[in-house]
Curated annotation (Swiss-Prot):
Class in the EC hierarchy, top level: hydrolase
SMART domains reported in the protein's UniProt record: KR, Tryp_SPc
Biased composition (Low complexity): 19-30
Disulfide bridges in this chain: 50-127, 71-110, 99-122, 164-241, 185-224, 213-236, 278-355, 299-338, 327-350, 392-469, 413-452, 441-464, 506-583, 527-566, 555-578, 620-697, 641-680, 669-692, 726-803, 747-786, 775-798, 840-917, 861-900, 889-912, 954-1031, 975-1014, 1003-1026, 1068-1145, 1089-1128, 1117-1140, 1217-1233, 1309-1376, 1339-1355, 1366-1394
Name of the featured protein: Apolipoprotein(a)
Top-level taxon of the source organism: Eukaryota
Miscellaneous notes: Apo(a) is known to be proteolytically cleaved, leading to the formation of the so-called mini-Lp(a). Apo(a) fragments accumulate in atherosclerotic lesions, where they may promote thrombogenesis. O-glycosylation may limit the extent of proteolytic fragmentation.
UniProt cross-references to PROSITE patterns, sorted A to Z: KRINGLE_1, KRINGLE_2, TRYPSIN_DOM
Domain Peptidase S1: 1191-1418
Function: Apo(a) is the main constituent of lipoprotein(a) (Lp(a)). It has serine proteinase activity and is able of autoproteolysis. Inhibits tissue-type plasminogen activator 1. Lp(a) may be a ligand for megalin/Gp 330.
Organismal lineage: Eukaryota, Metazoa, Chordata, Craniata, Vertebrata
Gene3D superfamilies, A to Z: Plasminogen Kringle 4, Trypsin-like serine proteases
Family: Belongs to the peptidase S1 family. Plasminogen subfamily.
Keyword Signal listed: no
């Protein structure tokens, strides 16, 4: 739909025989289409006309612009209103929409039919006039126009009509008015969009007419201010005349009127790339007027201190030629430089080249004697070398005595005699023969290449950005003997500890045999020494792995990972794979890595608009095209390539910064990341990228190139649809490089937190193979998946197919036990079946695994992963063995035959168009058992509800006999697999405890602990007890506990887990918690507490020695400084301290509960939390349905599954609002519910009800004794009951949140109530709905709630509508599940309409009022 028509990819025959076929006369039938709309709207390039002079005499019928747009008719005012009409220009030949030049500009033009582009030049060429005759253009006398001169069309020059200027262009008086980037010039007399002082009044001799290019104040070339508000000025797209005859036009004297503009503001501020100067030697003698850096930044004036303060002033350097902002070299460095106008970049070298001095003469630089400067040596500018001025070193660089002082990442070297920012022992005194002068790169202790300490406090040292000399002549410089003075530095501290990227090694197979000296990771981090425990403690030591070659900090693979790796020196990143490539094994040798020399230029030329290739000019590429450096820039469908340096129309990361060796010049086709052939991003906004229209070169013996195998963390890349991987089982073993989802979205890198924050990182899933952005399955999902780069879609399954195994093509379906996830899978596009392909099924079709996807009425099946058009709960995650693949027909819930949901919104589901197979002895298949949970829904709607963490597994005795599949601890952490040593090394393995049932990561009790436990996947928490409760022994008796005989272990007693006595865990605290002596050690956000006696990661003064009476034991929550509640320092280096996840005790009887005495067995491991009693707050005894439907439309809750729900009623028994029980005597509701009557006697509450009208016998009805409204007018109120409610399995309070806690966006929560259901099923019964928290900033957008949501309110719902609070639900609860209980997060307050699209509900944020709530309850 986006491309109406295109020419075919055909070439014209050569007509080599000299004959040409006369085209036939084509007389088209008259068309009613408007002339400008008739298709096609472009002229064929082969039918090309030409014009003479400037085209005023042109009377042809061409009507297409240089960009292929159709011309607007001259008599039409749509889409552009104008004054070039046949009436105003009677002699202009303005017929229909033909190209014309009515007001003499450079060439014929027209207004376009594109509303976004007013006008363009026509795609015509100038006639050659080879015979020497020229047609005199017509005299066109236009009717006077009222259009402003600056508005007069046209406003661009045609690129084919190019003028030139002499010298610096001061004498130029042409009519060109387009810049080098194609922008239109602003009129010199106009102050819009840029205010300036270059006016005809101030520069009377400057020729400042209309918006023509000029050079009023002598700079390098003609320029102008632009009509783009974002770009003040640019040089014009003019070339310098060749002056081949030796004559030059003397520029006129331009005497400007004095200007008040500051020198640093004087325009222009950039040089035109075509006007390039050069310098001799190191540029000290350079006195040119260039003032642009190598990255295109404008120079700061030497006399200015903004934006950078410095000492290179004309006063301090009187002989340095420091005039205006021209490039200079006042203190001899490598080349001319300047300070920049960019506040973030202090200085850079100028974009100048060194003169060739081909004649053998060189200009002697003047002696520059600067005034003494007070600047510190490390501040002296410049701090970088110009890339074009590159030196080299011989051998390992010990003999190097050059003056280079920049590292491979562009950091400046620290002076060898300086101890700031890094203290070291490589000083001139200790290494007198090493040439440690100033901050020049050196190699004092022979390592791989010259290096230096950096001036960046976070990076100690790096190799220098030097290359090794070729030594082509066969001579090598012998490095001098360097005898350093003995150093006190430890052997392991010896620098350097990283390799230069230029010195690249490779490894074979998985790299277990690698014994090289590389010590840098894929992200450039330095490796930690294997014998060191700083910053990461570990067990991969030379002592434990004597044969693994764990020397110094070199990359190794001691434990059969997929490639060499190391621990890093970054405290926040435990380990990474090394930046090594796998050796390419051939018959005789290892292929060398391809050396790619990129274009050293970073000038603006790389930003030029892309061009198209003629079909006749066809390149070819070798191999996969990584070595291709041609200039082709057209895709296989004829689209033009986007420039690699441009982010329009497609944002990407394939830039020269990330791919410096990829040859990413202009918009040329390249293959920077090892695709199957060269490709590029396209200029079509609807097509992100395509392969280029290039062919592979014929392979000959001399044309085979070595393929680059560089491993990097480059930005992810889409896969070609033709390059498809497959995976085995559930894909946990998949290690391919596919990175595209089922909907074509690009995967987010696992190490990235943008656009989606997550915890699937290599730190938490070290064996998950989470490399780059490749599809993986780290947590036992049904197939490989990834987070997406689309901020609107968190994650999706990958576009991979399951591998076909064995000859019979039967897919092995693994037993998948998924980790519980709160993330909703994304949709997968359904497929259709060919009517001729008919399957059959056995029995009732539960065993059917075919690919049929059409119903008996011919409708297409909806994908099981999709919620469109029908929402449902039959997803692969809940039925892992039911074969719910794509949109194939299945029968996983014992229907009479296979069926599916349909793509027809009006038909929810139908049986599939399958027949039953004839029953024979060989055709009977074993039907898998798929047992759904019984439901009150219609059979066709049944779906098993999610397993709620609230209704838990249980164990008998001490849990040694437990063989369940629970794998979550009491704090919600995932268990580590018993056979894994990551992140915690241990000896509780299936081999050592063969009878203990140590399967996968399931909770077990192999060594007679108090109850089942496991090691956790959190590196900061070694082990915890599991979130299990003890079974009631009255129901089924005590199971016999098996005897577990462990294999003798060498583990020390202090390492054995668990070894301490099960602590008594206090779940609540009294007052402000100063008396709390429980063993809870987790904060409100789930972080683990830091030990009070530890100074890592946070240093503090709350130690047992300083606070001897506060019982600062281990890492237990305490309140040593009379804060508002118990707290602790956290193990997260980025979060110093937080309040603990404890609630205040109710103290309803008025007595203070004495904390129990806890006498733990001494242990080095922090204890964990014990499961609490069954009637604790937020823990219903009936499993909630957690229906994803809406209140409007009906989803009846399971009776008593939301036991804190209150029906607030009048004294006559009429329900009018909801409420939440938060303690036996207190109910929380909305203040708006109490507006009618202020007396408490008017209200009563109903507890434990499921039906609104016919109340059950167990319901509790209690009068209200007091009302408390929030004092500042928030929509929240407290009701005190006349007597305490009786807490039963049907009446349980909800838990209050921590004060001021802000719940994260997209958290799943639930609302409940008996409110208005608009006539849908289930009216009068308690209903529930799932909704998501939405950020207030999103809700406050003008298209949603337009700034009406306050910070003390939270927004939740579905922007598409369908789920919301309604009249009658006000005051009711919004609860969210957290770890093992439901927390009250909101009170239903207000919202425009009921379940309306783009109008989510608004709820009172309870955490903002916890202090007020607790104060009222405490004082009343």
């Amino acid at each position: 739909p986006n491309v109406r028509w295109e020419y075919c990819n055909l070439t014209q025959c050569s007509d080599a025989e000299g004959t040409a076929v006369a085209p036939p006369n084509v007389t088209p039938v008259p068309s009613l289409e408007a002339p400008s709309e008739q298709a096609p709207t472009e002229q064929r390039p082969g039918v090309q006309e030409c014009y003479h002079g400037n085209g005023q005499s042109y009377r042809g019928t061409y009507f297409t612009t240089v960009t292929g747009r159709t011309c607007q008719a001259w008599s039409s005012m749509t889409p552009h209103s104008h004054s070039r009409t046949p009436e105003n220009y009677p002699n202009g030949g303005l017929i229909r929409n033909y190209c014309r030049n009515p007001d003499p500009v450079a060439a014929p033009y027209c207004y376009t039919m594109d509303p976004n582009v007013r006008w363009e030049y026509c795609n015509l060429t100038q006639c050659s006039d080879a015979e020497g005759i020229a047609v005199t253009p017509l005299t066109v006398t236009p009717v006077p126009s009222l259009e402003a001169p600056s508005k007069q069309a046209p406003t661009e020059q045609r690129p084919g009509v190019q003028e030139c200027y002499h010298g610096n262009g001061q004498s130029y008086r042409g009519t060109y008015f387009t810049t080098v980037t194609g922008r239109t010039c602003q009129a010199w007399s106009s102050m819009t969009p840029h205010s300036h002082s270059r006016t005809p009044e101030n520069y009377p001799n400057g020729g400042l007419i209309r918006n023509y290019c000029r050079n009023p104040d002598p700079v390098a070339a003609p320029y102008c201010y632009t009509m783009d508000p974002n770009v003040r000025w640019e040089y014009c797209n003019l070339t310098q005349c060749s002056d081949a005859e030796g004559t030059a036009v003397a520029p006129p004297n331009v005497t400007p009127v004095p200007s008040l503009e500051a020198p640093s503001e004087q325009a222009p501020t950039e040089q035109r790339s075509g006007v390039q100067e050069c310098y001799h030697g190191n540029g000290q003698s350079y006195r040119g007027t260039y003032f642009t850096t190598v990255t295109g930044r404008t120079c700061q004036a030497w006399s200015s201190m903004k934006p950078h303060s410095h000492s290179r002033t004309p006063e301090n350097y009187p002989n340095g030629g420091l005039i205006r902002n021209y490039c200079r070299n006042p203190d001899p460095v490598a080349a001319p430089y300047c300070y920049t106008m960019d506040p973030n970049v202090r200085w850079e070298y100028c974009n100048l080249t060194q003169c060739s001095d081909a004649e053998g003469t060189a200009v002697a630089p003047p002696n520059v004697t600067p005034v003494p400067s007070l600047e510190a040596p490390s501040e002296q500018a410049p701090t970088e070398q110009r890339l074009g001025v590159q030196e080299c070193y011989h051998s390992n660089g010990q003999s190097y005595r050059g003056t280079y002082f920049t590292t491979v990442t562009g950091r400046t070297c620290q002076a060898w005699s300086s101890m700031t920012p890094h203290s070291h022992s490589r000083t001139p005194e200790n290494y007198p023969n090493a040439g440690l002068v100033k901050n020049y790169c050196r190699n004092p202790d022979p390592v791989a290449a010259p290096w230096c300490y950096t001036t960046d406090p976070s990076v100690r040292w790096e190799y220098c950005n030097l290359t090794r000399c070729s030594d082509a002549e066969g001579t090598a410089v012998m490095p001098p003997n360097i005898i350093p003075v003995p150093s006190l530095e430890a052997f392991l501290e010896q620098e350097p500890t990283e390799e230069t990227p230029g010195v690249q090694e490779c490894y074979y197979h998985y790299g277990q045999s690698y014994r090289g000296t590389y010590s840098t990771t894929v992200t450039g981090r330095t490796c930690q020494a294997w014998s060191s425990m700083t910053p990461h403690q570990h067990s991969r030591t030379p002592k434990n792995y004597p044969n693994a070659g764990l020397t110094r900090n070199y990359c190794r693979n001691p434990d059969a990972e997929i490639r060499p790796w190391c621990y890093t020196m970054d405290p926040s990143v435990r380990w990474e794979y090394c930046n090594l490539t796998q050796c390419l094994v051939t018959e005789s040798s290892v292929l060398e890595t391809l050396t790619v020399v990129p274009d050293p230029s970073t000038q603006a030329s790389s930003e030029e608009a892309p061009t198209e290739q003629s079909p006749e000019v066809q390149d070819c590429y070798h191999g996969d095209g990584q070595s291709y450096r041609g200039s082709f820039s057209t895709t296989v469908t004829g689209r033009t390539c986007q420039s690699w340096s441009s982010m329009t129309p497609h944002w990407h990361q394939r830039t020269t910064e990330y791919y410096p060796d990829g040859g990413l010049t202009r918009n040329y086709c390249r293959n920077p990341d090892a695709e199957i052939r060269p490709w590029c991003y396209t200029m079509d906004p609807s097509v992100r990228w395509e392969y280029c229209n290039l062919t592979q070169c014929p392979v000959t013996e001399s044309s085979v190139l070595a393929t680059s195998m560089a491993v990097s963390e480059q930005a992810p890349m889409e896969q070609s649809p033709g390059v498809q991987d497959c995976y085995h089982g559930d894909g946990q073993s998949y290690r391919g490089s596919f990175s595209t989802t089922v909907t074509g979205r690009i995967c987010q890198s696992w190490s990235s937190m943008t656009p989606h924050w997550h915890q699937r990182t290599i730190e938490y899933y070290p064996n998950g193979g989470l490399t780059k952005n490749y599809c993986r399955n780290p947590d036992a999902e049904i197939r490989p998946w990834c987070y997406t780069m689309d901020p609107r879609v968190r994650w999706e399954y990958c576009n991979l197919t399951q591998c076909v195994v064995m000859e019979s093509s039967v897919l092995a379906t693994p037993m998948v036990v998924p980790v519980p996830s709160r993330e909703v899978p994304s949709e997968e596009a359904p497929t259709e079946n060919s009517p001729g392909v008919q399957d059959c099924y056995q029995g009732d079709g539960q065993s059917y695994r075919g690919t049929f996807s059409t119903t008996i009425t011919g409708r297409t099946c909806q994908s099981w992963l999709s919620m469109t058009p029908h929402r449902h709960r039959r997803i692969p995650l809940r039925y892992p063995n039911a074969g719910l693949t794509r949109n194939y027909c299945r029968n996983r819930d014992a229907e009479i035959r296979p069926w599916c949901y349909t793509m027809d919104p009006s038909v929810r589901w139908e049986y599939c168009n399958l027949t039953q197979c004839p029953v024979t002895e060989s055709s009977v298949l074993t039907t898998p058992t798929v047992v759904p949970v019984p439901s009150t829904e219609a059979p066709s709607e049944q779906a098993p509800p999610e397993k709620s963490p609230v209704v838990q597994d249980c164990y008998h005795g001490d849990g040694q006999s437990y063989r369940g599949t629970s794998s979550t601890t009491v704090t919600g952490r995932n268990c580590q697999s018993w056979s894994s040593m990551i992140p915690h090394w241990h000896q509780r393995t299936p081999e050592n405890y063969p009878n203990a049932g140590l399967t996968r990561n399931y909770c077990r009790n192999p060594d007679s602990g108090k109850h089942p436990w496991c090691y956790t996947t959190d590196p900061c928490v070694r082990w915890e007890y599991c979130n299990l409760t003890q079974c009631s022994e009255t129901e089924s008796g005590v199971l016999e506990t098996p005897t577990v005989v462990p294999v003798p272990s060498m583990e020390a007693h202090s390492e054995a887990a668990p070894t301490e006595q099960t602590p008594v865990v206090q779940q609540c605290y009294h007052g402000n918690g100063q008396s709390y002596r429980g063993t809870f050690s987790t904060t409100v956000t789930g972080r683990t507490c830091q030990s009070w006696s530890s100074m890592t990661p946070h240093q503090h003064k709350r130690t047992p020695e300083n606070h001897p009476n506060d019982d600062l034991t281990m890492n237990y929550c305490r309140n040593p400084d009379a804060d508002t509640g118990p707290w602790c320092f956290t193990m997260d280096p980025s979060v110093r301290r937080e309040y603990c996840n404890l609630t205040r005790c109710s103290d309803t009887e008025g007595t203070v509960v004495t904390p129990p005495t806890v006498i733990p067995v001494p242990s080095l491991e922090a204890p964990s939390e014990q499961a609490s009693s069954s009637f604790d707050c937020g823990k219903p005894q009936v499993e909630p349905k957690k229906c994803p439907g809406s209140i409007v439309g009906g989803c009846v809750a399971h009776p008593h599954s939301w036991p804190w729900q209150v029906s607030l009623r009048t004294r006559f028994g009429k329900h009018f609002c909801g409420g939440t029980l938060i303690s036996p005597e207190w109910v929380l509701t909305a203040a708006c519910c109490l507006e009618t009557f202020s007396r408490p006697s008017f209200y009563k509450v109903i507890l434990g009800a499921h039906q609104e009208v016919n109340l059950e016998s167990h319901v509790q009805e209690i009068e209200v004794s007091r009302l408390f409204l929030e004092p500042i007018g928030a929509d929240i109120a407290l009701l005190k009951l006349s007597r305490p409610a009786i807490i039963t399995d049907k009446v349980i309070p909800a838990c209050l949140p921590s004060p001021n806690y802000v719940i994260t966006a997209w958290t799943e929560c639930y609302i409940t109530g008996w409110g208005e259901t608009q006539g849908t099923f289930g009216a009068g019964l308690l209903k529930e709905a799932q909704l998501h928290v939405i950020e207030n900033t999103v809700c406050n957008h003008y298209e949603f709630l337009n700034g009406r949501v306050k910070s003390t309110e939270l927004c939740a719902g579905h922007l598409a509508g369908g789920t919301d609070r309604c009249q009658g639900d006000n005051g009711g609860p919004v609860v969210c599940f957290d770890k093992d209980k439901y927390i009250l997060r909101g009170i239903t307050s207000w919202g425009p309409g009921c379940a309306c699209p783009n109008k989510p509900g608004v709820y009172v944020r309870v955490s903002s009022f916890v202090t007020w709530i607790e104060g009222v309850m405490r004082n009343n």
